[in-house]
Every structure is written in C-alpha cells, then in structure tokens.
Amino acid sequence: MEDLYKIRFKKLKELSLRHNNISDIKVLEYFKFEKLETLKLRHNNISDIGILEKVNFKNLKHLSLYDNKISDITVLEKVKFEKLEMLNLGGNILSDINILEKVNFKELKELYLDNNKIIDITVFWKTKFEKLEKLGLENNKLDKIRFAFLIIKLKLKIKEFTM
C-alpha cells in the first residue's frame, strides 16, 4: 500500500469510472490527483463516501455520484472542495439532507438530488449556496407546502429548477 502513495497523475483532469461494480472508494486516498477537475462515479454500488474528507482534490469542479447506494452525506460538512461547481447525488437513497446547511461549497452552481427519498427540503432556507443556478429535486417525496415556500425563496436566485 505504501507504493500507492507514490502514484501521481500530474496531468489527469477527468477520471470516469462509470458503470462498474465499485463499492469501495477508499483507495482514492492513496492517489495524488493534482489537477483532477472531474470525477465520475455514476452507476456503481458505492454506499460509503466517508473517504471524501481525506482526499485532496483541490481542483475538483464536478463530482458525480449518481445511481449508487448512498444514504448518508454527513461527510460533506468536512469535505474541502473549494472549487466544486457541480455535485450530483441523484439516484441514491437519501432521505435526510439537513447536513447541507453546514456545507460550504462557495462555488457550487449545480446540485442534483433527484430520484432519492427526500421529503423535507426546508434545509434550503439555511444553505449558503450563493452561486447555485440549477437544483434538481424531481422524483422525490416532497411535501407540497414546504416546496411552495422553497420556490418563493429560490425564485430569484436559481436559473433552472426541476422537479
């Protein structure tokens, strides 16, 4: 395992591992992705994303975890993706997204949470996503009254909203 620390991808900007059978992404901790901007882990069997707090993806702009088995995103509070612009967590089994209140992705422009089990979206009253332009929440179990209030809050800030 110590040899893995020496592996560096000095120029790699995009890593796509879509449509595999990956369940454990802990190995990402051992690689140095100095210029990685896009990481695509769609359509796998990932349930634990805790390792994301240990990786150093200082240039990461796009992270897609669509269609996995993720139910817990509390690690996002500790993640240091200062340049992250797009986060896709759609197609998982998320129900509680209240941690988003504590997440500090200052550059986030697109957030996709579609195809989950989300009921309560009042957390968006408290989020700090000042640059958010697109929010995908379709195919969840949203409460209509809370949704109506959210739309009023987001109307002027977000360019595209899907439900």
Predicted stretch roles:
Residues 1, 117, 141-145:
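Intrinsically disordered low-complexity regions specifically enriched for long asparagine
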Residues 1-4, 22, 46, 161:
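Generic low-polarity alpha-helical segments
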Residues 13-17, 36-41, 60-65, 84-89, ...:
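Conserved hydrophobic beta-strand positions in leucine-rich repeat
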